[in-house]
A protein has these predicted regions:
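A conserved short coil-to-beta-strand element within the FAD-binding core of flavoproteins
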Residues: 178-191
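Flavin-dependent oxidoreductase catalytic cores
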Residues: 1-114, 118, 122-134, 142, ...
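Beta1-alpha1 glycine-rich phosphate/pyrophosphate-binding loop at the start
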Residues: 113-180
Length: 191
């Protein structure tokens, strides 16, 4: 809806806020720099990653967990009069129940996650953040599971943004990705 903010901005001297699918700090900067709006509002982007502004400020935009535009946990939930949430951030609405920091495992272990779909990648990320040595195996040649198929219809390609996020995170956490490799005894012996 940035084009609407830009149209309104040209009609008066009042402050204008751009809102809607502002996913990356570069996009927010461009809106302000090009005077399309005076401010930007982040809604769903902050549900997906509450640390969005802090990460942008410290130059860590690549680590921002992206909103994938599915509207299931946020907008759909509101329309159904249900508690809001976020498909890519399971902590939304439960922050008060969770520890302030991810606790390091007392005894780090070798962990194997079978399946490189979004759930498997999320599990691998959390295990690695807790200090475990993590390997992920999947019989498919690429990570993503059913998400790859779900992203094929027109207008759904940004579903892949969460896969790209996980792959970048897991690379930074030194997670051992074993794609095109089904689970078998030989694989278990090599870990």
């Amino acid at each position: 809806f940035v084009h609407l903010a830009e149209a309104v901005k040209g009609r008066g001297s009042f402050p204008v806020v751009a809102v809607g699918r502002i996913k990356r700090p570069e996009m927010a900067d461009e809106i302000i720099r090009d005077r399309k709006a005076d401010m930007v509002a982040l809604g769903r982007s902050l549900l997906a990653d509450p640390q969005w502004p802090a990460k942008a400020r410290r130059g860590a935009a690549r680590t921002i967990r992206p909103c994938i535009g599915c509207c299931l946990g946020c907008i759909h939930a509101v329309f159904q009069l249900e508690p809001g949430g976020c498909v890519v951030n399971p902590d939304v609405g439960r922050e008060y129940l969770l520890p302030a920091r991810i606790e390091t495992a007392v005894e780090p272990r070798k962990c194997l996650v079978v399946g490189a779909g979004p759930a498997g990648l999320a599990a691998a990320r959390m295990l690695a953040l807790r200090g475990h040595a993590v390997a992920v195996c999947d019989r498919q040649p690429q990570a993503g599971g059913a998400l790859r198929l779900a992203s094929k219809p027109p207008g759904r390609s940004e579903l892949m943004d969460i896969l790209n996020y996980f792959m970048e995170e897991l690379a930074g956490l030194n997670v051992d990705m074993r794609l095109n490799r089904a689970l078998d005894e030989e694989l278990l012996r090599t870990l």
